[in-house]
Amino acid sequence: MARRDVLLPFLLLLATVSAVAFAEDDPDCVYTFYLRTGSIWKAGTDSIISARIYDKDGDYIGIKNLQAWAGLMGPDYNYFERGNLDIFSGRAPCLPSPICALNLTSDGSGDHHGWYVNYVEITTAGVHAQCSTQDFEIEQWLATDTSPYELTAVRNNCPVKLRDSVSRVGSEIRKKLSWVV
């Protein structure tokens, strides 16, 4: 009987410690991207699209291939086509503060490398993180044959310029890097 009195509280303590430890090992957030491709003729692309999302301190999450990381539209769906609203939702480490900047990049591959992007909306949700939504108006071609002749669009809605929050200007922005895919 005495063993049972000691064993039961010990097992409860062990279960509680394990639950807390496992909860802290899973700090991931869910990031959902809504990307609207323009309805302009030839606005769609077959290129691989990557993104980096930044918080106000310059910490960021990098996603090498949005479609491979978290495409929700199904296996036969053709992403980034004219007029489409494409949705991607996946897990990645939580950033310390809400997203406020975006680097959206096309690799320029495929038969149709040019891509006209209307906007990107990103929502963030996490167990111990503040839920947030950030809208980025792009209204730009990501192409080498159309103005502005860039495969990257950068939008910064941060209250402080990212450059002011980091010590190394022009290089990788800060210390926290996580390439998801």
Curated annotation (Swiss-Prot):
Disruption phenotype: No visible phenotype under normal growth conditions, but mutant plant have enhanced sensitivity to salt, drought and cold stresses. Induction: By salt and cold stresses, and abscisic acid. It is found in: Endoplasmic reticulum; Plastid, Chloroplast, Plastoglobule. Residues 1-14 form the signal peptide. GO terms for cellular component: chloroplast thylakoid membrane; endoplasmic reticulum; plant-type vacuole; plasma membrane; plastoglobule; secretory vesicle; thylakoid. Pfam families: PLAT. InterPro entries: PLAT/LH2_dom, PLAT/LH2_dom_sf. Positive regulator of abiotic stress tolerance involved in the regulation of plant growth. May be a downstream target of the abscisic acid (ABA) signaling pathway. This is PLAT domain-containing protein 1. The lineage of its organism: Eukaryota, Viridiplantae, Streptophyta, Embryophyta, Tracheophyta.
